[in-house]
């Protein structure tokens, strides 16, 4: 039995030593070059792209795994591939310093399946999605998603729980995580105007706020000609951006094209 650690109260101010964000979320509209920028990251750092989007990285050089090996892969098959890859990464946790999850909307989509299985394992759902005493699987005749079964949005509790469980699992796999996500428009209040258009993470319901509160830094990928910036500026009450890391503020150049049209990335401005 190990000796119990003695707790002591501090007398001095502790200087913060952490300089890199453990969780970085990059949000953008489609076709902004986010995949190419993240793919380039894997050539410079010990990183892996966990591609959850069908065809997301088929034209991008990267250290990557995809849950959609072909265009014919179904959502049910992709979910099975996701679980197998996730478990393999857990078995070899620490193999990569950085895990890139692209994208969050696809993980949210799979949460309908994962959340249903989670409910089926609960006391409340012990008879749900059964036939002859056997558990049904997604795609089987008679299989019902939990959000379509529980009334008044009760099913979303289970999909949210499964989603956040995956986020905690990713923390076990690698010390640093990068998440790619799409944006959706949001009408927000402004002190000068009644309503203005802002942006937020494209996730279901309360999940966008819950997830955003759990990560270190959020940035919106913006364009200026051939240059791409990570914008950490917080506008109004939008949850699109912000960072607990004092190093990540304002707009930071993340990529640009050289005279030959090659993309040059500047990840050293984000990670030491």
Give the role of each language-model region.
Residues 36-41, 169, 210-211:
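Hydrophobic/aromatic ligand-binding patch that stacks against planar heteroaromatic rings
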Residues 47, 177, 218-220:
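Short, well-ordered beta-strand core segments
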Residues 50-52, 180, 221:
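Generic beta-sheet signal
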Residues 94, 172, 213:
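Structured loop/turn residues at beta-strand edges in well-structured enzyme cores
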Residues 103-210:
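P-loop NTPase motor core
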Residues 185-272:
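Conserved GTP-binding G-domain of TRAFAC-class P-loop NTPases and closely related GTPase folds
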